[in-house]
Amino acid sequence: MIEADRLISAGATIAEEVADRAIRPKLLAEYVGQPQVRSQMEIFIQAAKLRGDALDHLLIFGPPGLGKTTLANIVANEMGVNLRTTSGPVLEKAGDLAAMLTNLEPHDVLFIDEIHRLSPVVEEVLYPAMEDYQLDIMIGEGPAARSIKIDLPPFTLIGATTRAGSLTSPLRDRFGIVQRLEFYQVPDLQHIVGRSARHMGLEMSDDGALEVARRARGTPRIANRLLRRVRDFAEVKHDGAISAEIAAQALDMLNVDAEGFDYMDRKLLLAVIDKFFGGPVGLDNLAAAIGEERETIEDVLEPYLIQQGFLQRTPRGRMATVRAWNHFGITPPEMP
């Protein structure tokens, strides 16, 4: 199974990235959710503007689909500067990064997505650029090689990652601001779905937006994807208006249940409950039971189920929680 093939995958396709640009908030005043991040960034941005300085370098981390790129765009808009965007895998050579840095205007924002995937060679170039606004470049090769320093304008580096633990300490320590994005609460997702529906010209009730939000796994990207599929259903099967009933019908048809679980989530939980009496069950046995690779279970299926309290990892194996039994309307066995 490929994670990107799942309707409830938090990853984005190229088409979705293009479509989402039109409905992204542009300013902090439009930004919904993440109240602590929003209030802190408002102060940091205002302070930098009052001083006439570039904003401190900013690291944004958290699960995929929560709006790290959106926040980077908002920072650039609020600061009134240009945003240059790239990603860790794209910056293969030191010269690739040097070319971007030397083209920055004062106070510009350089956004590096997947910054944990920077090569060590590129990372070494980044250290003096972040700390001293200087670029060290080697000219020539062998014994005749020499280093020259190029002054850079003050700029803000925004790094985004889903794996903050994979960053090296020297890189992580050079960020003056670190923000973690959390999964969104349902009321905030409802607001986001309603806003997206208005941008898309859809007629949608508050209850319809709530139904989509409940099944979006705390993730705006998933919420917007589900909204597009609900729109398709409403236009073909009804008059295009989206109520709670129509949203529920559409999402049930798409095999996304009230908890945001898809077929594979339910298959895993039911395997633990039905085939292994609720567990504990070893990872290899579970992988064989559902016909998936153990890496797929560990990296794709398990994290959300564990976060939401439906599955437990124990030293003896995986166990279904009481909440998982109740989700399927099955009475859990009495604990000894």
From Swiss-Prot:
Disulfide pairings: none
Keyword annotations: ATP-binding, Cytoplasm, DNA damage, DNA recombination, DNA repair, DNA-binding, Hydrolase, Nucleotide-binding
InterPro entries: AAA+_ATPase (IPR003593), AAA_lid_4 (IPR041445), DNA_helicase_Holl-junc_RuvB (IPR004605), P-loop_NTPase (IPR027417), RuvB-like_N (IPR008824), RuvB_C (IPR008823), WH-like_DNA-bd_sf (IPR036388), WH_DNA-bd_sf (IPR036390)
Keyword Nucleotide-binding found: yes
Ranges for region Small ATPAse domain (RuvB-S): 185-255
Enzyme Commission code: 3.6.4.-
MF GO annotations: ATP binding; ATP hydrolysis activity; four-way junction DNA binding; four-way junction helicase activity
GO CC, alphabetical: cytoplasm; Holliday junction resolvase complex
Entry superkingdom: Bacteria
Top EC group: hydrolase
Residues the record lists as binding DNA: 294, 313, 318
Binding site for Mg(2+): 69
Residues noted as binding ATP in the record, renumbered to the chain: 23-24, 65, 68-70, 131-133, 174, 184, 221
Function description: The RuvA-RuvB-RuvC complex processes Holliday junction (HJ) DNA during genetic recombination and DNA repair, while the RuvA-RuvB complex plays an important role in the rescue of blocked DNA replication forks via replication fork reversal (RFR). RuvA specifically binds to HJ cruciform DNA, conferring on it an open structure. The RuvB hexamer acts as an ATP-dependent pump, pulling dsDNA into and through the RuvAB complex. RuvB forms 2 homohexamers on either side of HJ DNA bound by 1 or 2 RuvA tetramers; 4 subunits per hexamer contact DNA at a time.
Domain note: Has 3 domains, the large (RuvB-L) and small ATPase (RuvB-S) domains and the C-terminal head (RuvB-H) domain. The head domain binds DNA, while the ATPase domains jointly bind ATP, ADP or are empty depending on the state of the subunit in the translocation cycle. During a single DNA translocation step the structure of each domain remains the same, but their relative positions change.
Protein name as it appears in the record: Holliday junction branch migration complex subunit RuvB
Source organism (scientific name): Salmonella arizonae (strain ATCC BAA-731 / CDC346-86 / RSK2980)
Lineage: Bacteria, Pseudomonadati, Pseudomonadota, Gammaproteobacteria, Enterobacterales
